[in-house]
Swiss-Prot record:
Gene transcribed to yield this protein: Hsd17b1
Subunit structure: Homodimer. Exists predominantly as a homodimer but also exits as monomer.
EC assignment: 1.1.1.51, 1.1.1.62
Enzyme class, UniProt record, top EC level: oxidoreductase
Protein name: 17-beta-hydroxysteroid dehydrogenase type 1
The protein's annotated pathway: Steroid biosynthesis; estrogen biosynthesis
Taxonomy, superkingdom: Eukaryota
Glycoprotein in keyword set: no
Role noted for this protein: Favors the reduction of estrogens and androgens. Converts estrone (E1) to a more potent estrogen, 17beta-estradiol (E2). Also has 20-alpha-HSD activity. Uses preferentially NADH.
Catalytic activity, reaction form: 17beta-estradiol + NAD(+) = estrone + NADH + H(+); 17beta-estradiol + NADP(+) = estrone + NADPH + H(+); testosterone + NADP(+) = androst-4-ene-3,17-dione + NADPH + H(+)
Phosphoserine modification, residue list: 135
One GO biological process term: testosterone biosynthetic process
Length: 344
């Protein structure tokens, strides 16, 4: 039986590297993996991981592929000796983090070029053959940042929102050609991704006003805490295998349930008010409480202990969602049933 030919982008580290080695070392020996990197000088960790995991000879080949360059994509495609790719994994990605006005436009363009146009270049190269053969799987490394807006991730979220629309649109069409598209929705993962943020965290911060810089510094402390609780890449790679092996793969697979209540809020209140208020609460309520305490002020409608903050949800927001977020209906005088408390 012919092996399943898998081509993966962005394999110098993180999810791409772990997935390539996981498939190439699989005991079934049913995968032939083409692990691609933008620069072959960065292949050292991948080679070491393959050696450590005992990848059999011929199970893993490393190719140079820069998703920003159509000629590079075509050259890598020509190196696939089987003449086909059964599973295409679009994993290469780039991040940008900090106040929007602090970013250089070339850094913004680089993120969009890799995350959006890079994925499109790969699809344009490999989809035609999959459609001709009436067989193929496309897996795209996505992010909760493509399902909900996150402060100080505006450009990154824009790129990931674009991937959601791209893949969802293709998922409607491609089953007619025997091809399936799946998004692997990741939260924070322990990879080098966060060390490679374009321009570093915040970029040229002096371009932002003092209040925005203050808010960013506060947000960054919570962000660092979130990264300390990130998943290991090995956990996430198993989701890719699930999507590969499913007879009828889903459009989305989630590596964590942590953000699902917030994501559901966006669909259950199409106005967006519930989600915006909830994320504001999540990101900045501690700061507001601290500043109120420093000023000797009391948050209106909240007890002197200031141990909880109030957020008002529109009537269309389902109470179950609030409950999943750890909120309870407020019984305080003057508050209606659309108000909930969350301990902070």
């Amino acid at each position: 039986m012919d092996p399943t030919v898998v081509l993966i982008t962005g394999c110098s580290s993180g999810i791409g590297m772990h997935l390539a080695v996981r498939l190439a070392s699989d005991r079934s020996q049913s995968f032939k993996v083409y692990a691609t990197l933008r620069d072959l000088k960065a292949q050292g960790p991948l080679l070491e991981a393959a050696r450590t995991q005992g990848c059999p000879p011929g199970s893993l080949e490393i190719l140079e592929l820069d998703v920003r360059d159509s000629k590079s994509v075509a050259a890598a495609q020509a190196c696939v000796t089987e003449g086909r790719v059964d599973v295409l994994v679009c994993n290469a990605g780039r991040g940008l983090f900090g106040p929007l006005e602090a970013h250089e436009l070339n850094a913004v363009g680089a993120v969009l070029d890799v995350n959006v146009l890079g994925t499109i270049r790969m699809l344009q190269a490999f989809l035609p053959d999959m459609k001709r053969r009436h067989s193929g799987r496309v897996l795209v490394t996505a992010s909760v940042g493509g399902l909900m807006g996150l402060p100080f991730h505006e450009v990154y979220c824009a790129s990931k929102f674009a991937l959601e629309g791209l893949c969802e649109s293709l998922a409607i069409l491609l089953p007619l050609f025997g091809v399936h598209v799946s998004l692997i929705e990741c939260g924070a993962v322990h990879t080098a991704f966060y060390e490679k943020l374009v321009g570093g965290p915040g970029g040229a911060l002096e371009r932002a006003d003092a209040q925005t810089r203050h808010l960013f510094a506060h947000y960054l402390r919570g962000y660092e805490q979130a990264l300390s609780e990130a998943q290991d890449p090995e956990e996430v790679t198993e989701l890719f295998l699930t999507a590969m092996r499913a007879p009828q793969p889903a459009l989305r697979y989630f590596s964590t349930n942590r953000f699902l209540p917030l994501a559901r809020m966006r669909t259950e209140d199409p106005s967006g008010s519930s989600y915006v208020a909830a994320m504001h609460q999540e990101a900045f309520s501690n700061l507001q409480t601290q500043e109120n305490a420093k000023a000797g002020a009391q948050v209106p409608g909240v007890s002197d202990t200031a141990s909880s903050a109030l957020i008002c949800l529109p009537e269309c927001a389902i109470p179950r969602v609030a409950s999943e977020l750890g909120w309870s209906a407020s019984d305080k005088p003057g508050q209606d049933n659309s108000c909930y408390q969350q301990k902070i």
